């Protein structure tokens, strides 16, 4: 049987949605609130329902062979600081829970993706900078 993987919400999320805890999924941003990793945080990389552990990006442990591996943390030691509401059913669940306490929840606007034009311009600027450096290096080599 799988464990219910609910994690407490941060104070501002509690106030915003009127709920204390919510199931954690990949993509949520969490913070460790107790234990040896207290204060560390990051995006949830994996939720293992069988073992009841949550793996967070950036929190690793060294294996015997020297490689780094994800460190499983118990959900009761975590706090959600940012919810991933990209899945529609998840937002609907929050909305229904908030309605019980007469809290109206507005659907958050999705974060804007960087435009391809901007990224192409940035790429061209980088290429020009590299080309200028090469010409400077070539000029210095010719002088020496």
Swiss-Prot record:
Bias kind Basic and acidic residues: ranges: 103-134
InterPro entries: KOW (IPR005824), Rib_uL2_dom2 (IPR014722), Ribosomal_uL24_CS (IPR005825), Ribosomal_uL24_euk/arc (IPR005756), Ribosomal_uL24_KOW (IPR041988), Translation_prot_SH3-like_sf (IPR008991)
Coiled coil: none
Keywords: Ribonucleoprotein, Ribosomal protein, RNA-binding, rRNA-binding
Transmembrane as UniProt keyword: no
GO function terms (MF aspect): rRNA binding; structural constituent of ribosome
NCBIfam families membership: rplX_A_E
Gene3D superfamilies assigned to the protein according to its UniProt record, in alphabetical order: 2.30.30.30
Entry's Gene Ontology BP terms: translation
Phylogenetic lineage: Archaea, Methanobacteriati, Thermoplasmatota, Thermoplasmata, Thermoplasmatales
Keyword check for Cytoplasm: no
Family: Belongs to the universal ribosomal protein uL24 family.
UniProt function note: One of two assembly initiator proteins, it binds directly to the 5'-end of the 23S rRNA, where it nucleates assembly of the 50S subunit.
GO cellular component: large ribosomal subunit
Biased composition (Acidic residues): 135-144
PANTHER family: 60S RIBOSOMAL PROTEIN L26 FAMILY MEMBER (PTHR11143)
Protein name: Large ribosomal subunit protein uL24
Subunit and interaction comment: Part of the 50S ribosomal subunit.
Annotated stretches, region: Disordered: 102-144
Pfam families with a match to the protein in the record: Ribosomal_L26
């Amino acid at each position: 049987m799988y464990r219910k993987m609910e994690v407490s919400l941060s104070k501002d999320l509690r106030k915003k949605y009127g709920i204390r805890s919510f199931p954690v999924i990949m993509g949520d941003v969490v913070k460790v609130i107790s234990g040896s990793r207290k204060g560390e945080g990051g995006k949830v990389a994996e939720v293992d329902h069988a073992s009841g552990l949550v793996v967070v990006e950036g929190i690793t442990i060294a294996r015997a062979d020297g490689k780094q591996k994800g460190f499983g943390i118990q959900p009761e030691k975590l706090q959600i600081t940012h919810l991933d509401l990209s899945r529609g059913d998840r937002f609907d669940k929050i909305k229904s829970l908030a309605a019980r306490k007469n809290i109206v929840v507005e659907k958050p606007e999705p974060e804007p993706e960087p435009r391809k034009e901007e990224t192409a311009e940035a790429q061209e600027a980088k290429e020009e900078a590299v080309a200028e450096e090469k010409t400077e290096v070539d000029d210095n080599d010719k002088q020496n």
